[in-house]
Amino acid sequence: MLQFILRRLGLVIPTFIGITLLTFAFVHMIPGDPVMIMAGERGISPERHAQLLAELGLDKPMWQQYLHYIWGVMHGDLGISMKSRIPVWEEFVPRFQATLELGVCAMIFATAVGIPVGVLAAVKRGSIFDHTAVGLALTGYSMPIFWWGMMLIMLVSVHWNLTPVSGRVSDMVFLDDSNPLTGFMLIDTAIWGEDGNFIDAVAHMILPAIVLGTIPLAVIVRMTRSSMLEVLGEDYIRTARAKGLTRMRVIIVHALRNAMLPVVTVIGLQVGTLLAGAILTETIFSWPGLGRWLIDALQRRDYPVVQGGVLLVATMIILVNLLVDLLYGVVNPRIRHKK
């Protein structure tokens, strides 16, 4: 087991270095002068322009800027935002909490709906329900997030007036932003908020969670169905049926438990999909998370924010994938003993 862990950790280091290099190169390839963007319509004198370039370290050769960036990362310094002059880490934390809360709710929705639908589709293979589930899963997987979000807003929020259009809570909800309990709005409003605040936070969460969870839901349905069909054809399932076990016991205890191994892996790998989808979802619903933060930073060429934000997001994806690999090695010894 130790060798398995060391092999996985050995892959993390070069991946991390590659991410820093690609992120740095990508950010500096974006056209536009960050100093001129900061100045806006006011303009700036050549002397002041050169002074700001020197203060931001942008007057140095690329390799020196990269080494300075790596040195800061190794010491936990991701830089300071060019716009707000606030350390990137301090800007990252509250936005990460907002995105994490949205991502967890989206994954709960996708898992709670996807696994039962996938199991039922496999059990009723060839039925109308099976064909409908597969068709909807394919549609959900290929559906543009932006279009799907706008359609739900028009139908549910505007036409039916059932949920709010944007934000995490309504303007009338008061919470002490300077001293949040957890940073997660659902928890804070449940513990600290006044009557109705929690319901308001839940109402704001519904549509973004559905939109963000649609693609993972489609993937989970397809993987659960495929894995269940494979397991239901195994000899030990036929043996369990021959022993007179009830159909429900065979499906839940014997089939589903073994079919969940690839499903768990897929769920873990959906973290990247959630973070990518969060960029569009947060833009549509004005959700103050990582997606909107990075998009705003890209538009104003805020190099430290983009580099630090992408690096932190990539690190989270790497750690989650590493955790999934380790858990899969625990539940499936053949994987960890494989050379």
UniProtKB/Swiss-Prot annotation:
Gene Ontology biological process terms in this record: dipeptide transport; heme transmembrane transport; protein transport
Disruption outcome: Inactivation of the gene abolishes use of heme as an iron source.
Domain ABC transmembrane type-1 span(s) in chain numbering: 96-328
TM ranges: 10-30, 103-123, 136-156, 172-192, 201-221, 260-280, 310-330
Membrane topology: Multi-pass membrane protein
Gene3D superfamilies: MetI-like (1.10.3720.10)
UniProt topological domain (Periplasmic) ranges: 1-9, 124-135, 193-200, 281-309
Cytoplasmic-side positions: 31-102, 157-171, 222-259, 331-339
Keywords of this entry: Cell inner membrane, Cell membrane, Membrane, Peptide transport, Protein transport, Transmembrane, Transmembrane helix, Transport
Chief location bin: membrane
Keyword Transmembrane listed: yes
Keyword ATP-binding included in the entry's annotation: no
InterPro entries per the UniProt record, alphabetical: BPD_transp_1_N (IPR045621), MetI-like (IPR000515), MetI-like_sf (IPR035906)
PROSITE patterns reported in the protein's UniProt record: ABC_TM1 (PS50928)
GO cellular component: ATP-binding cassette (ABC) transporter complex, substrate-binding subunit-containing; membrane; plasma membrane
Family: Belongs to the binding-protein-dependent transport system permease family. OppBC subfamily.
PANTHER family in the record: DIPEPTIDE TRANSPORT SYSTEM PERMEASE PROTEIN DPPB-RELATED
Subunit architecture: The complex is composed of two ATP-binding proteins (DppD and DppF), two transmembrane proteins (DppB and DppC) and a solute-binding protein (DppA). MppA can replace DppA as binding protein for heme and ALA transport.
Physiological role: Part of the ABC transporter DppABCDF involved in dipeptide transport. Responsible for the translocation of the substrate across the membrane. When a foreign outer membrane heme receptor is expressed in E.coli, DppABCDF can also transport heme and its precursor, 5-aminolevulinic acid (ALA), from the periplasm into the cytoplasm.
UniProt-recorded name of the protein: Dipeptide transport system permease protein DppB
Species name: Escherichia coli (strain K12)
Lineage: Bacteria, Pseudomonadati, Pseudomonadota, Gammaproteobacteria, Enterobacterales
